[in-house]
């Protein structure tokens, strides 16, 4: 009782076509298709970039990690010790 038959879907489609018109539906379909295509191309480009990054990661794995210090960073423990002592 909760599922719709094919006739229900056809009637809904007919009402949608009457409300929006076939031209607007065609535009929506082409916009959706181009969005999916763009998404797939972006995913493909992302997977092509990934192997290049993994090679850099392998080269950096042999080197010890460097500590980055920022002049605006405050070491909280050192500040607390200086206040106490």
UniProtKB/Swiss-Prot annotation:
It comes from the Bacteria. The gene is tatA. It holds the Pfam family TatA_B_E. Belongs to the TatA/E family. The keyword Cell membrane applies. Keywords: Cell inner membrane, Cell membrane, Membrane, Protein transport, Translocation, Transmembrane, Transmembrane helix, Transport. This is Sec-independent protein translocase protein TatA. One of its GO terms (biological process) is protein transport by the Tat complex.
């Amino acid at each position: 009782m909760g599922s719709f038959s094919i006739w229900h879907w056809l009637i809904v489609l007919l009402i949608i076509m009457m409300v929006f018109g076939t031209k607007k539906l065609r535009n929506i379909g082409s916009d959706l298709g181009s969005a999916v295509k763009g998404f797939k191309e972006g995913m493909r480009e992302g997977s092509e970039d990934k192997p290049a990054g993994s090679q850099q990661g392998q080269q950096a794995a042999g080197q010890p990690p460097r500590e980055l210090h920022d002049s605006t960073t405050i070491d909280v423990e050192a500040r607390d010790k200086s206040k106490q002592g």
